[in-house]
Amino acid sequence: MKTKLFKTKKYTAMRKYLYILFALCMFLSSFGVWGQPNNTPVSLRWNNGGQAVKGDFIQIGNIRNFSTDAQSSATLKVPTHSSCLRVKWAGLYWSAYVPIGDRHDSRIEQVKFKMPGDTQFRDLRADVHMYSNFANSGDSYNCFKDVTSLLQSKGANFNNGEYTVSGIYSPNTIGSWGGWTLIVVYEDIQAATSKKIYIYDGAEWNFFNYNGTQTKTIPITGFQTPPAPAAIKARMGIFTGAGDRGTGYTSADEIRINEVKQGQNSNPNAYDDFMDESITYNHSEVAMPRNPNTRNHIDIDIFDIPNPGNTVINNGDTSLTIKFVASDAYITYTVALSVDAIAPLLI
């Protein structure tokens, strides 16, 4: 004898809820990571709780080496003669382009890391995984790992040494890029001034089409520069992907601080072609030792912001703006900024 299943009102309502749940799941899967938009906006990662640092930051990095399991290295050298340095904060980022089908691949969040004096790599897993999709053609991810304690364990030997990253996941497909950067905030008790330091990260395309020039502005607040007649100094570092050198989209590819263009007259980091696949320190590729020393659509640039007569950042300023202006698409992974600031006297 067969049992007949009666479709009660309760059963019908449950089936309706299941349909709604299924539709919601399909909607969420059209985003990046579940519940996360396809574009992870660049936002504040670290600013020392708003307190000034008697020191500054330094940034190094390199491309993903497609020929040797993505292994590449760069040399960190703090631009000071002080012998009294210590690590305040350090963050490692690795980023790459992957096909859409690989957006949830667990290998994305894993790399190998080697510091000065190490004889073996150590395995790292990302603390945060950010990513963005461009025109449904592929994904670009950005992974962050706090490595402060690792660098602090080196003492003063964190400086003047080679750092190596291996295993950045990215299939060898046409148009692929990948790379890593290490941002280190250091304290220097011999420093003449204190600085407010801001570290931003994300995975944010500056735009999603090629319909003219578009902009992205990051406001920086919460500091106060010293009073006159002090000369105000500031430093900026960036890590971006998908940049091109001289591709025809260079009529507007700029970084502006308080609306003043940054860069120089020619590549690398030309005023109108800043995102040009260069890895530089103060617009010099020679000043950023790395292996291999090649280009692959990755920009890692750290530079002191020219401020003649305090015409860009003035005495007593409490805010500034960083503006990205471009008619070529690129993705911003990290932005770092330091600026002279008044620090309270600690008794």
Residue ranges and their predicted role:
Residues 1-37:
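Bacterial Sec-dependent N-terminal signal peptides
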Residues 6, 345-347:
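Short, intrinsically disordered, charge-balanced linker/junction segments flanking boundaries
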Residues 34-344:
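Disulfide-rich extracellular domains of secreted proteins
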